[in-house]
Swiss-Prot record:
Binding sites annotated in the UniProt record for NADP(+): Y167
Lineage: Eukaryota, Fungi, Dikarya, Ascomycota, Pezizomycotina
Function description: Ketoreductase; part of the gene cluster that mediates the biosynthesis of sphingofungins, bioactive molecules acting as sphingolipid inhibitors via inhibiting serine palmitoyl transferase (SPT). Does not seem to be involved in any biosynthetic process leading to the production of sphingofungins, but might be connected to a regulation or resistance mechanism.
GO molecular function, one term: oxidoreductase activity, acting on the CH-OH group of donors, NAD or NADP as acceptor
Keywords linked to the UniProt accession: NADP, Oxidoreductase
Stated family: Belongs to the NAD(P)-dependent epimerase/dehydratase family. Dihydroflavonol-4-reductase subfamily.
Induction or repression: Expression is positively regulated by the sphingofungins biosynthesis cluster-specific transcription factor sphG.
Top EC class, one word: oxidoreductase
EC nos: 1.-.-.-
Name of this protein: Ketoreductase sphI
Pfam families given in the database record: Epimerase
Biotech uses: The sphingofungins A, B, C, and D, show a limited antifungal spectrum of activity but are especially effective against Cryptococcus species, fungal pathogens causing opportunistic infections in human.
Disruption phenotype: Decreases overall sphingofungin levels.
Gene that produces this protein: sphI
Length: 333
């Protein structure tokens, strides 16, 4: 009997590549959809050639972009999303909404597909203008998640925060798109969304120390080395990449019902805790982070993922160590 086939997007990235490796180790076959070939990903997966096939779609926003590509698949994991990279709305909003819609619509045409898991973000559980005072981020808050797509996002008092605000807005829009599609189209498959906090840990496709800026690890590394979290989302908590990967595979379990949403966030954690690890174990690093940073992370409640997915969160210390150790390996320290 053939192992289940997963159609997966976003596998060229930090989280996607780690998820792909874990799925292959678990015995799944993968049909990996990329915008263009990736040498880093192909090298990473070279030992699994009999379980992997690649398909290339240059424009994921085109009508029928995925037509026929999901045929025979059992599951879909949609990880792809524009990363924070510039101030243009079109870079974020159009791919986030149109690619999500196109993929969900095509999946509805394929009778073999049992479940679609969409990788959303903690950002999709946070109002664009901030959470209410004393609020706790969780899956079922009755907050205002609307996005004014006509907003002039470039008119900001925090220019460095513009890409993150646009990313936040695009995650809200993509999440709303997914659930609105389920409500109106009533697809035959189950839909599950995962909402990780900022993801930290070893990056399987990072090849240089400088490339850390291409993933969420760059946020942690910047804070460590400069002592200043550099964006307006510095209070957003983190989660270890291995926990997020595990959650993706557990979400494929038939016991996880249609309509499930899961916040993925480690418990506790403060910038002081990060600084303590650095000063204790990496004093030679030249880092500027100090324990007197008073800013605490936003409150979260990820008990639903613990109860239903069986999640047990890795500690902040492991996130810090894994990121720093990989950077030191690139520097041959």
């Amino acid at each position: 009997m053939a192992h289940p086939l997963v159609f997966i997007t976003g596998a060229t990235g930090f989280l996607g590549s780690a998820t792909a490796v874990a799925a292959l180790k678990a015995g799944y076959r993968l049909r990996i959809c990329v915008r263009k070939p990736s040498d880093e990903l192909q090298n990473l997966l070279s030992g699994y050639s009999e379980q992997v096939e690649f398909v290339t779609v240059a424009d994921w926003t085109a009508e029928g972009a995925f037509r026929g590509l999901l045929d025979g698949a059992d599951y879909v994991i949609h990880l792809a999303h524009p990363i924070p990279s510039g101030p243009e709305k079109e870079y974020y909003f159009t791919p986030a909404v149109k690619a999500t819609t196109a993929l969900l619509r095509e999946a509805a045409r394929v009778p073999s597909i049992k479940k679609v898991v969409v990788t959303s973000s903690i950002a999709a559980l946070m109002p664009l203008d901030g959470i209410p005072s004393g609020g706790v981020i969780k899956e079922d808050n009755d907050w205002d998640f609307d996005v004014d797509e006509t907003e002039d996002f470039a008119a900001s008092n925090d220019p460095r925060g513009i890409p993150m605000r646009l990313y936040h807005a695009s995650k809200l829009l993509a999440n709303q798109t997914a659930w609105e599609f389920r409500k109106t189209a009533k697809p035959p498959y189950a839909l599950v969304t995962l909402h990780p906090a900022f993801v930290y840990g070893r990056n399987p496709v990072q090849t240089t120390a400088e490339a850390i800026q291409e993933s969420s690890n760059g946020l942690l590394w910047h804070a460590i080395m400069t002592g200043v979290p550099h964006h307006s989302y510095s209070r957003v908590p983190g989660v270890h990449i291995d926990d997020v990967v595990e959650a993706h595979l557990r979400a494929l379990d038939p016991a996880i019902p249609d309509g499930s949403k899961y916040l993925l966030a480690a418990k506790g954690g403060t910038w002081k805790e990060v600084a303590d690890v650095i000063q204790r174990d990496y004093s030679y690093l030249g880092a500027k982070i100090t324990p007197d940073i008073e800013e605490e992370f936003l409150s979260t409640d990820s008990s639903k993922a613990e109860a239903e997915l069986g999640m047990r969160w890795r500690a902040w210390e492991q996130m810090v160590r894994d990121v720093v150790d990989q950077q030191l390996e690139f520097a041959n320290v």
